[in-house]
Amino acid sequence: MNYYFTKGKPQLVNMKTPIYLVTQFQQLMDLMQNQYEVSCLELMQRSGKAACDFLVYRWPKVKKISIFCGRGDNGGQGYVLAQQAKKMGMVPTVWQVGHQMSMSKPPQMHKEVWYEMNSCHQQGIVLHTYSPDIDLGDPELIVDALFGVGLYGHVRPEIALLLQRLQQFTVPILAIEVPTGINASTGEIAGNALAATATITFLCMKLGLLINDGKIYSGEIAFDDLLAPEAIYQQVKGIEESSLLDSSTFFSKKIWYRNKTQKGWQLSIN
């Protein structure tokens, strides 16, 4: 049972969002790029812009935001968010974790991430290299763009210390795709994890956000389908939620939806 709030009044509607494992999500991404010819850069830009849209919708008064970017695609989404935030009048501070600004593409960094990193630089957004002893200032909101679904194994000790440091802030935390330290398929903690106030996830709902520790650490969930065609969800079937999720999984869970037919966000409380 989903309730969507329109002008403060709940309306009962019937809407299902496909739930997927990470391996299935990767199949969807491959289809988007190879069959539907949506480039990796375009997907990164769509997701980063959607994340910024949700941030503004959810916390309209926030101005100073700190974005922690890893060197993978999740970091690229964070760089896109930073650019959008600046265009919308916010003051973004970008913290590069595990890498730094470079005029040539670093090894093991995807060209799309490097492109967005340089786009930030060209737009006058200062990129700071994170270190444990650096002053993080007083942000009004923190964006977790460190790993997303790209975390394999346990969180490294230096990242665990960063997560502990960020958790001490008393400001909202928005995670992009998946909170750092949460396994996107199992919902288990990979050694250490950052509890988010809200998580925005793309293309499909990840099972790990809804079960085990993931349903706690993800906070509210926002979902954007990145303009994916409906046919893609028939080509890669999601899991049957009834076979994997107990009846209490969605209880009091706030899930914000947006798809290609909507301009705004709708709130579902199951």
UniProtKB/Swiss-Prot annotation:
- Per UniProt, what is the name of the gene that codes for the protein in this document? nnrE
Pfam families assigned to the protein according to its UniProt record, in alphabetical order = YjeF_N
**What family is reported?**
Belongs to the NnrE/AIBP family.
CC cofactor note: Binds 1 potassium ion per subunit.
Q: Which sites bind (6S)-NADPHX?
A: 73-77, 148-154, 177
Cofactor dependence is on: K(+)
Residue limits of the YjeF N-terminal domain?
A: 25-234
MF (Gene Ontology): metal ion binding; NAD(P)HX epimerase activity; nucleotide binding
- Name the Enzyme Commission number(s) assigned to this protein: 5.1.99.6
The enzyme's first-digit EC class, named in words, is: isomerase
Coiled-coil positions are none
* Reaction(s) catalysed (UniProt annotation): (6R)-NADHX = (6S)-NADHX; (6R)-NADPHX = (6S)-NADPHX
Q: Where does K(+) bind?
A: 74, 144, 180
Q: What is the lineage of its organism?
A: Bacteria, Pseudomonadati, Pseudomonadota, Gammaproteobacteria, Legionellales
- Family matches, as HAMAP family: NADHX_epimerase
| Keywords, alphabetical | Isomerase, Metal-binding, NAD, NADP, Nucleotide-binding, Potassium
Entry's Gene3D superfamilies? YjeF N-terminal domain (3.40.50.10260)
Entry protein name: NAD(P)H-hydrate epimerase
Q: What does this protein do?
A: Catalyzes the epimerization of the S- and R-forms of NAD(P)HX, a damaged form of NAD(P)H that is a result of enzymatic or heat-dependent hydration. This is a prerequisite for the S-specific NAD(P)H-hydrate dehydratase to allow the repair of both epimers of NAD(P)HX.
Q: Cite the InterPro entries for this sequence.
A: YjeF_N_dom (IPR004443), YjeF_N_dom_sf (IPR036652)
